[in-house]
Amino acid sequence: MKRALVSVSDKNNLVPFVKGLVANDYEIVSTGGTKRVLDEAGIPTISVEDVTGFPEILDGRVKTLNPYIHGGLLARRELPEHVATLKEHKITPIDLVCVNLYPFKQTIEKPDVTLAEAIENIDIGGPSMVRSASKNYRDVTIVVDQADYDQVLAEIEKDGSTSLETRARLAAKAFRLTASYDALISQYLTEKAGETAPEKLTLTYDLKEAMRYGENSHQKAWLYEDALPKAFSVLQAEQLNGKELSYNNIKDADEALRCVREFSKPTVVAMKHMNPCGIGQGNTLEEAWDRAYVADPVSIFGGVIALNRKVDLATAEKMHKIFLEIIIAPDYDEDALAALKTKKKNLRILKLDFSKKDEATSKETVSVMGGLLVQDQDVLDEDFADWECVTEAKPTQEQLESLLFAWKAVKHTKSNAIVVANNERTLGVGAGQPNRIDSEKIAIDHAAEALDDRAVLASDAFFPFSDCVEYAGKHGIKAIVQPGGSVRDQESIDMANKYGIAMVFTGVRHFRH
């Protein structure tokens, strides 16, 4: 007769699985609550205490940490000396372990969890058994996921045991589980200790889906979600219509959400290839849409749209007229949703709770060859009070509002970034050029006939030379916002004074790559 050790916190589907083991001549060793469930189901079990000859102690903290358990798991059956040691100490080999771990993740996700509660839900004995069984997978089957119950039983019923290939696969899966489990504990305790740059960094994510392809069709791709999901994330959005999200869809939608959360008035952000092609705000969402659309009616085709208010019918009918990849909003009126779905089976319509948009943000990571860059997200809260006017001309209140709008927009534009705007919408966006003057030329060219005495300009970084200010002055720009900090700042200030431009320094740069 073979022996299985069963000790789980999640008891779903457990009884049928264990009954299958018993039917195939396994005796069952179990602990605590698991044993009670199996006993109540009429399944004969042996308590761990009967195996070890030692009771549970320290409120259950020590149950299975015993040579009679780990010797039975780690002994190599092909080595005569190991077999002799088992016989000498009367240790019975264990052939299968079914374990899942204390719900540490679920515990720390509770809003009012205490450190003491979290600590008590750090499993010690479970991971120890998982690791012992996994290390000795040549002889022991480790089962940590109820999704594997059926396959394990099927192989046992057919061949008397699982295959070596299956045991190796299950062992790798089990080590992934313990690694992820430890990573969450490490992350939680590191945050509690106030450490921001630990000497070791282990991140853990859960596979959400395999994607059709990556950034390009020849690239394979998978979507993983943070093991502690963030509420304000495209990955938490409810999809109401359309095809599955692509790799590029998710990146654009993420950037659109980052951008739209900057604004408090009804706002529409149109994102294309990680750059805003149009941002509009107004007293109503429809008005905001009109302004975002007119900002660049060409580039918005095939774009990703983020809105920060519930979508009404009037706005929906206007969006429905053009091809869009994604619409994401806090909610939709019933008739608005129906209108968007009409003859648009592929349009991805997403609903996301915007009430959590200001929750604490996690670190950003970017992979580089051989490493990982980690930084805080660029979520600095800025306002007029943080700015310094450095020119003879001073911005009017309307210009200040326009400058703040443009500053929020340029923050989400790829560097080198220039945005021309008023306090209602972007007029022109220049993104991603190796030199700043070229980005400015693109932005002003896009603004074209919309340039008037209300137009202002924002730059994500300082002007290295005065040419950008001169170009702006020649095209009628009357107010500029930029970080300042160049060794040639005075040249730019002098040029602004020459053209009567009000220029403010923020002291903060917003590179985005």
Swiss-Prot record:
Q: Which UniProt keywords apply?
A: Hydrolase, Multifunctional enzyme, Purine biosynthesis, Transferase
Any single biological process term in GO? 'de novo' IMP biosynthetic process
- CDD domains associated with the record: IMPCH
Which Pfam families does this entry report, sorted A to Z? AICARFT_IMPCHas, MGS
Q: Which GO terms describe its molecular function?
A: IMP cyclohydrolase activity; phosphoribosylaminoimidazolecarboxamide formyltransferase activity
Q: Which Cys pairs does UniProt list as disulfide-bonded? A: none
According to the entry, every stretch annotated as the MGS-like domain falls at 1-144
Q: What pathway annotation does it carry?
A: Purine metabolism; IMP biosynthesis via de novo pathway; 5-formamido-1-(5-phospho-D-ribosyl)imidazole-4-carboxamide from 5-amino-1-(5-phospho-D-ribosyl)imidazole-4-carboxamide (10-formyl THF route): step 1/1; Purine metabolism; IMP biosynthesis via de novo pathway; IMP from 5-formamido-1-(5-phospho-D-ribosyl)imidazole-4-carboxamide: step 1/1
Q: Which SMART domains match?
A: AICARFT_IMPCHas, MGS
From the Swiss-Prot or TrEMBL record, give the protein name: Bifunctional purine biosynthesis protein PurH
Species whose genome carries this gene? Lactobacillus delbrueckii subsp. bulgaricus (strain ATCC 11842 / DSM 20081 / BCRC 10696 / JCM 1002 / NBRC 13953 / NCIMB 11778 / NCTC 12712 / WDCM 00102 / Lb 14)
Classification from the root reads:
Bacteria, Bacillati, Bacillota, Bacilli, Lactobacillales
Gene name of the record: purH
